[in-house]
């Protein structure tokens, strides 16, 4: 059963323990104990670069055409009212009200107190809003998200809109153990040769996601 907004708020009080765990996991005698929490089977993320130079031409925002198929093909979509990371950290640099977009069957089971179901057009508008706010989109399949919301882990996927100051994944990359890097990949936009020759920076028909970074 999915968790109520009040329960999620209570669980978020434990948020500071996450940073402590990142640091403890770097200690040799604790790394073996905490390593299961950093396995790809429990947590996977792909960070999609924003505003990077493509094909030697102008700098463009690529994520939208890469993320749109995920949104369009999902069986259900749910927009969370507030970013868990920015809410827990008290972010002052970016809007906390731009929350994660959950996709898949489990998204339909999120407690409506946490946000709202979304149509394809509403979900795509939310993605665009996150990009315009300067947030970095990250495709995440994290057991923590499923646990805190009380939804099935294997039936969900999330598109998070991350800031460098509060994102728990980015904090883990900076402060966590080497094993944390195994759970995160850097997406890369790759264009077909004919588009490069034509000087086209980016467009949906020629843009594909290369998860190998």
Positions of predicted regions on the chain:
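Iron-sulfur (Fe-S) cluster-binding modules
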Residues: 1-142, 147-159, 175-213
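Short functional micro-motifs and their immediate structural scaffolds
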Residues: 167
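Short Cys/His-rich "knuckle" micro-motifs
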Residues: 170-172
């Amino acid at each position: 059963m999915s968790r109520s907004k009040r329960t999620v708020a209570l669980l978020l009080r434990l948020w500071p323990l996450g940073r402590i765990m990142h640091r403890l996991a770097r200690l040799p005698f604790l790394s073996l104990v905490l390593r299961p929490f950093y396995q790809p089977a429990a947590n996977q993320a792909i960070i999609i670069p924003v505003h990077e130079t493509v094909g030697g031409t102008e700098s463009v925002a690529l994520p939208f055409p890469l993320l749109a198929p995920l949104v369009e093909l999902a069986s259900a979509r749910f927009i969370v009212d507030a970013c868990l990371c920015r809410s827990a950290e008290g972010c002052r640099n970016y809007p906390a009200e731009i929350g994660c977009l959950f996709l898949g069957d489990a998204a339909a089971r999120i407690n409506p107190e946490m946000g709202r179901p979304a149509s394809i057009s509403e979900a795509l508008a939310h993605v665009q809003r996150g990009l315009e706010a300067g947030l970095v989109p990250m495709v995440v399949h994290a057991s923590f998200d499923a646990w805190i919301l009380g939804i099935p882990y294997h039936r969900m996927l999330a598109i998070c809109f991350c800031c460098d100051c509060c994102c728990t994944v980015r904090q883990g990359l900076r402060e966590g153990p080497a094993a944390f890097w195994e759970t995160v990949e850097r997406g890369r936009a790759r264009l077909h040769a004919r588009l490069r020759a034509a000087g086209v920076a980016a467009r949906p028909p020629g843009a594909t996601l290369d998860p190998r970074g």
